[in-house]
Amino acid sequence: MFARSALGRSDQLVTALNSQKRQFVLTAATTALGSLLFSEDNRLASQMEKGLLHNKNAENSASIPNTANKFFSRPEAEYPGHVPLYTFEKMLMFLGSSVGAYTHPERNEFIVALGESTAITPVLRRLQHQMLSDPVGRQILRERPRMTSTSLDLEHLRELPDNTIGKTYVKWLDKEGVSPDTRVEVKYIDNEELAYIYQRYRECHDFYHAITGLPIIIEGEISVKVFEYMNIGIPMSGLGALFAPLRLKKSQKERLYNIYYPWAFKSGLNSKPLINVYWENILEEDIDEFRKTMGIEQPPDLRNLRKEYFKKLKEAKKIV
Amino acid sequence: MQDIVVIGGGPAGLSLLAALKSSPKTRHLSCTLIEGSSLQSVRDFLVEPPEEYTNRVVSLTPKSVEFMQQKVGNWDFIKQDRVRFYDNIVAYDSQDNDARIEFDATQIGAGVLAVMCENINIQSSLIGRLNELGMDDSTTILDNTKVIDITSPIHHDLDQHDLNEIDVNSGKSDLDWPIVKLSTGESIQARLLVGCDGYNSPVRKFAGIESRGWQYNTFGVVATIKMQYEDHRSIGWQRFLSTGPLAILPLSEDNATIVWSSTPWLSELLLKVNPDIFPHLINAGMTLEEVDLKYIYSMLDKDPNDFKVLDEIQWRLSKIDIKSLEENYPLPVVELIQNSRARFPLKLSHADTYVAPRVALVGDAAHTIHPLAGQGLNMGQSDVGFLVDALEKGIERGLDIGSTMVLDSYVANAWPGNHMMLGVCDKLHKVFTTDFGPVVLLRGLGIKSLNMAESVKDLMIKAISGR
Ligand SMILES: Cc1cc2nc3c(=O)[nH]c(=O)nc-3n(C[C@H](O)[C@H](O)[C@H](O)COP(=O)(O)OP(=O)(O)OC[C@H]3O[C@@H](n4cnc5c(N)ncnc54)[C@H](O)[C@@H]3O)c2cc1C
């Protein structure tokens, strides 16, 4: 019932956009609904029974007069900062933020909201499953480490030898001009353990850049997202990989399709789950050793490739 | 020469003997029961039962209890302080703890859903009843005596006869009565030979009756345990894990028994896990998610004495809401009774028929069933009832009790009901031991709609309790 109304609404929302964009929103909405419906069937059955999957509109509650209020009171927060949302609100948030992220990719709030609204329970539960199946994953869930510029002691990392993970990481932060504190708090995910898992995933994201050496310019970001999607299965990354390239220039697309997508697919699939890496504990370890044990190949340096490309362009112009 | 020779002194064999001796119409028949192992512990139990519970415990339906009270007369000899009536079964799903179904017998005014009772308590009550009836020349129990051979004087044609280790040349007689050769060197010839001799029934093989079915490649691990304190809720708990159902069934006071159906690998693990870890493992099995269970099993597989798992279990338990833990789950298990763990291979089998000329099969000799609905021994009780009915009628009409004319009505009455029960339990087992997505979804929905559809449930309660 709700599926139809959501798609209906998305139709209205995108009539103003061109057909390509509509295609994206529909695909994305279907993907999200699909994973919502099929990935964790049984939990869904419970939700269905509790009425969580239904659009709790006036009509519904009118037929159950005595409990009408119960349906409209917001559930209690599960952890500090938690904003409990109804499923249909999450769907709206997803639709709104995906349109927003597409038209305003520079505005972080859309990206963040898109991330949280697509990181719906089934996906997070898959991550939780991965973590609970692994000793280190379990250790992380138990100790709940948080990554901030203070918890990581960046000064100390700067003094580590060049080939350590810590030094690679801090070098990458410095090169890209970002800090661990630029990550936003999770607030829309309902279960506190799942919320932590998503927080953890966000906080580790920079390490994925660091170990792969990919910059945060758009092509790098897309490549890391594909890599992440293959490795972890967060749909936000998959979506990013699907629609983001549409806005790229031809030369950028070629680099992506010929070099970075194949690399991301291969490395992402073959390497061990990155969510189970306790980064804080391996900062002093050798980065090449780490890549080897994890099964990650390093992609060609994107900035170098771009430089070469521009150099070639210039030379070509000079000649002409 | 005997009118009836019963092979097997398990619950089925002893029930049949006591029922025959209790009925005014069959009392006069000369009967001999032969049991391969010793029944001494059964007799001792009658005089002085051990302090702790034994590990073979069954759930009896009210119908079976009624049968014992009214037809066999052994219920008075049951040690009542060792049985536990319960009125509620809560079954739920490991892949979704919210998918649960409750059978509350009090809701349909039935009072009791089932009764937990040790096998040996039943067996000893039957001995008690037989003693009361008086063991005369027409009632003989030979224990410590194995049947080593069964022959038929008329089966001289080797090609026609299913041999199965049976020496056809030994018997020489003008009668077609089967001859039972015993480990004591004695031979007895019987007008009617009844096989209450369990799954591998030598009698069934002798009669050439085909039995169909399959091994589940699953073991039932049983154990006797102590709960934190006595649970006054009187609930039988069952959780469907992807490896098979785990049930905790109440006994008197803080005692309880478990049946944990599991894969061969898991059953081995359950038997070798440190006895002090075992109770916690049951608690984990009743509450935690499959992913945690798998992790814990793998830790214990590496080291069955790894007490670090307690920490893991505690941590994951702390994620469950306390109130829900108290209301929706069994009490914590705190102790494993020493040496009470054992495992039994589970299988489904059903004989094509229960009779042949001068032969009848009763109990596990005729059918074996998955224990998830606690029906095996109860089916044997209803077999005994139908067989005695058939013999009573045959005697009334002056017929030969070994003839198929008499025996056929036993099959006609007993077989279809058993077949249905076997089918239902087989389907339940198959539906619940899968983690194939669509089936899990359907069963989640199914179990919930079942829980809501009161009329369907009432029917099932009636079926479970045999009413
Ligand atoms: C784990 C588990 C849990 C169960 N839970 C329940 C439950 O909750 N409720 C329920 O109703 N049922 C339950 N059952 C089933 C129940 O235990 C059996 O159905 C019942 O014990 C069968 O009784 P029986 O007398 O037919 O056969 P058995 O108990 O197998 O008796 C056969 C007897 O024949 C003797 N015998 C065999 N061959 C010879 C020979 N050649 N010579 C002499 N003697 C011989 C054997 O020594 C044996 O004593 C459960 C079974 C298992 C494995």
Swiss-Prot record, chain A:
According to UniProt, the reaction catalysed is: a 4-hydroxy-3-methoxy-5-(all-trans-polyprenyl)benzoate + H(+) = a 2-methoxy-6-(all-trans-polyprenyl)phenol + CO2
State the annotated membrane topology for this chain.
Peripheral membrane protein
Where in or outside the cell is it found? Mitochondrion inner membrane
Which InterPro entries would you find in this protein's record? Coq4 (IPR007715), Coq4_euk (IPR027540)
Q: Give the signal peptide range.
A: none
Residue spans making up a coiled coil are none
Q: What class of enzyme is it?
A: lyase
State the GO CC annotations.
extrinsic component of mitochondrial inner membrane
Q: What does this protein do?
A: Lyase that catalyzes the C1-decarboxylation of 4-hydroxy-3-methoxy-5-(all-trans-polyprenyl)benzoic acid into 2-methoxy-6-(all-trans-polyprenyl)phenol during ubiquinone biosynthesis.
**PANTHER family hit by this protein:** UBIQUINONE BIOSYNTHESIS PROTEIN (PTHR12922), UBIQUINONE BIOSYNTHESIS PROTEIN COQ4 HOMOLOG, MITOCHONDRIAL (PTHR12922:SF7)
Put simply, this protein is called Ubiquinone biosynthesis protein COQ4, mitochondrial
- The gene that this protein is the product of is COQ4
